[in-house]
Amino acid sequence: MNSLVLIDTSGWICFFSRRGYDEIKKVISTLLDEDRVAITGPILIELVQGARTEKEKEDIKRYMRGIHWLPVMDDHWHKAAELAFNLRRKGITSSAIDTLIATLAMEYDCHLLHKDSHFDLISRSFPLKCYQ
């Protein structure tokens, strides 16, 4: 498997955590070494929003600069809206940002590395490939 892996905010939180999550840290480190990690604006916003200090914010932004960037295009918003509608009809509730992230992973044919169970729910009904 050599495709890009979009790492959700939940995965990055584990990676940047000072304690625990050794397995996911190892996986993300390997993906970074293989130049297979992707980021997108909504994830960057969530990461920077969660920074506790100015230094931490700048460190996150600097760290993300060397990673593959997946832009959000106009059509992605429309596809995310359709996905949100279809998810709701199946009884699955997801935030607007997470619905957009799932849409981007599907549109760019990336695997999505995450620690949020609702992405697994989405992948059961839609072609979202979750990184295992």
Language model region names:
Residues 2-4, 102, 106-132:
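Acidic, PIN/NYN-like endoribonuclease modules and their adjacent C-terminal/linker elements
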Residues 7-8, 40, 93-95, 116, ...:
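Histidine- and aromatic-rich ligand-binding microenvironments
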Residues 12-13, 44-47, 119:
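A generic structural signal for short hydrophobic patches within well-formed alpha-helices
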Residues 1-39, 49-62:
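Short, well-structured N-terminal submotif of metal-dependent ribonuclease cores
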